[in-house]
């Protein structure tokens, strides 16, 4: 039997090439990239390299402008708060009931 998964909003299967690329960081280079010891530097270097690659792919973006977040909620909150800070004179956020709760909760605060 073949499974058809239709809840990709919650989670989705990881592409095999992503699993292959990330395996070293789940098994061997799992260190805190903010630490000062050598294995941690490997993790930090990998993050720096990923940030530079993404900036290059986006074009016209500095690596320092690429932010990594831990989840969709954090990403949504960062984007919404960033837009609000960029437009301090604007006092309203328009959203709808079909938005993800992370978006409308953030908009309400």
What does each model-identified segment do?
Residues 1-109:
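Pyridoxal 5′-phosphate
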